[in-house]
Amino acid sequence: MRKMSKRQQEILDYIVAQVKLKGYPPSVREIGEAVGLASSSTVHGHLDRLEKRGLIRRDPTKPRAIEILLDKPEEDHEAIVHIPVIGKVTAGFPITAIENIEEHFPLPAHYVGNENVFMLTIDGESMINAGILDGDRVIVRQQNTAENGEIVVAMTEDSEATVKRFFLEDQQVRLQPENDSMDPMYFDNVSILGKVIGVYRTIH
């Protein structure tokens, strides 16, 4: 039998991760969104191949009836979730960043738990004192509130998104860079898109 394709492995990893996280398998639509496949028929095709390999079993009468049949013990398969990577945030001089999903990035499920998260790529050096460097990917938990001092993704009044440390002072919002050479930004109002809960960095 031919080696399982990368896409089939992604789908299998996602199903395993969702069963571990939620206790039930994802729908075909959710699988497609997680691995970047718009066509449900394409997803069904990959599921057919996984079923022929004896890795899953499906009940065609039910939308979520996918049973995992793995030869290896469950603990040998670390749960993986595919995090959407959304646009790009400039740290320093903000640019419009909330665009369509660019890709999905695999992470161990225990990194994010049951949180609703996304990732953004940092472009700039305004957060270097917080250990967030140019080119890093930050892991962001979606939420619309923040406590003083938390690092957030905020949408400004000019519809620009940026990563900064949040402070509410005298009915005014201060977005504070973590770079001694940069000045704070002040706004009457901002929209909180999420709180930064982690950083992913590739060492070249």
Curated annotation (Swiss-Prot):
Active site: S126, K164
Catalyzed reactions per annotation: Hydrolysis of Ala-|-Gly bond in repressor LexA
Keywords recorded for this protein, A-Z: Autocatalytic cleavage, DNA damage, DNA repair, DNA replication, DNA-binding, Hydrolase, Repressor, SOS response, Transcription, Transcription regulation
Class of the enzyme per the UniProt entry, highest EC level: hydrolase
GO MF annotation terms: DNA binding; serine-type endopeptidase activity
DNA-binding region: 28-48
EC numbers for this chain: 3.4.21.88
InterPro entries, per the entry: ArsR-like_HTH (IPR011991), LexA (IPR006200), LexA-like (IPR039418), LexA/Signal_pep-like_sf (IPR036286), LexA_DNA-bd_dom (IPR006199), LexA_repressor (IPR050077), Peptidase_S24_LexA (IPR006197), Peptidase_S24_S26A/B/C (IPR015927)
CDD domains the UniProt entry points to: HTH_ARSR, S24_LexA-like
Function summary: Represses a number of genes involved in the response to DNA damage (SOS response), including recA and lexA. In the presence of single-stranded DNA, RecA interacts with LexA causing an autocatalytic cleavage which disrupts the DNA-binding part of LexA, leading to derepression of the SOS regulon and eventually DNA repair.
Organism the protein comes from: Exiguobacterium sibiricum (strain DSM 17290 / CCUG 55495 / CIP 109462 / JCM 13490 / 255-15)
Protein's recorded name: LexA repressor
